[in-house]
Amino acid sequence: MLDTFLERPHQMTKAPERWSPSQAVRLAIDWRVGHCVALALGGVLTGQGAIAQDRFLPQASAVVLAASVHTAGGRSSTLRALDQAWRAQPQDLSAALAYARAVFTLGFNEGDLRWFGSAKAALTPWWQATDLPADGHFMRGLVKQGFHDFDGGLQDINRAIALDPARAEFWSWRFALHLLLANMDAAQQDSEDIARLFGPQEGQIYSAVLAYRTGQALAAVQKLSESIRLPDYQDAASQVWIGFHLGEAHRVAQQPEQAIALWQRLLQVHPQSHLLRLSLADLLNQQGRFQQAKAVATASSTQLNSNLTDALLMQALLASRGLKAPDEAALAQQMAARLQSQALRQESLIERPKLIYQIAYGKDLAAGLALSIENWQQQKEPPDAVLFAQAALARQQARAAEPVVQWAQTTGYTDPQLAPLITQLKAHPSWSKERP
């Protein structure tokens, strides 16, 4: 769940190609995207077949469609050409890397990370290779972290940096993974190295992200407010990337109205940004502005919401509950069907929408707490900390969330949602009981 520095690839005047955040990190550090819909492949993904992209509730005997994920209409001719080139020469590393990068990026941009399975399929012949070029290690590292092998992903990205230290995107993702793993000292070093290698303007952005993740949100707001106005960062990807983090800094600094206004403005200019749409819908729900949250989450949705990501569907469901809207039951049924479909496909990783459904929506608090405990062992992100604390309190097991309290104390992180929950955990009668 890297919910994320996924960026669309682009070139900048002073910094090499970078990927926009979009849900990291779930992915690298997109803290709000309900990321990493990784699949238990079980031999299903091969060079000739991949998980079907369209949502479906399969029969137990047919949980996977063998057709290319790109046979569905609407895909660009460029993507189709990359797909065909890879399938024509599945042992050609260059073709495989080009295809893997394209579908990995698509998964993030669409908020549907089942495309990660397609990326892994392309890289399967080199999954154990030790002599890859820098791009090979980098792409394999991204896919590994997408499947929650964060240590393996970090090893590959470290190797990519060793082979080609002049690639800014390599450093960006390593910074993101260090944040995900709560290794703040390493993230600080990455930030300093980025400033040294790619200039102080670039370094300032990373130091600002680190600032709001370590209790210095107002300083982050000031830095990011400067960065978003710089001439070198006026391209679409940079505006979304910096704007997302500036909004997060506002939110963490107890300035939700500023965050909402910023994300609304950016979303009007970049309506295809899943990251901005999800972040805005989530914050509007947090603020009790359910009508607006639902409108943002369901913009351009089909009648049955089949084109909504799980994360956006979950926000629509929370908004409908807040509104006491008559479609709440139907939305809940759609969410349950998707989770059932994932179970039939044997998807083994924990998505944030599932945690929200179980905990914030209250469908299964016991299961939600168990999943939170498991998830926290892998990755440590603010939205997951909130859900973990909520589940522990609801189940009268405050001490179960002690790792969240320790993480907050160590990193200095706090936000308007988490702070009162930590106070409640420490004051709860079960907190003073013997540790489990």
What does each model-found stretch correspond to?
Residues 50-135, 427-431:
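N-terminal leader/linker segments that initiate helical-solenoid repeat arrays
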Residues 90, 131, 165, 198-199, ...:
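Short coil turns that delineate tetratricopeptide repeat
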Residues 95, 136, 170, 203-204, ...:
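TPR alpha-solenoid repeat register
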Residues 98, 139, 173, 206-207, ...:
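Canonical tetratricopeptide repeat
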Residues 106, 110-113, 147, 181, ...:
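Structural motif corresponding to the intra-repeat A-B loop/turn of tetratricopeptide repeats
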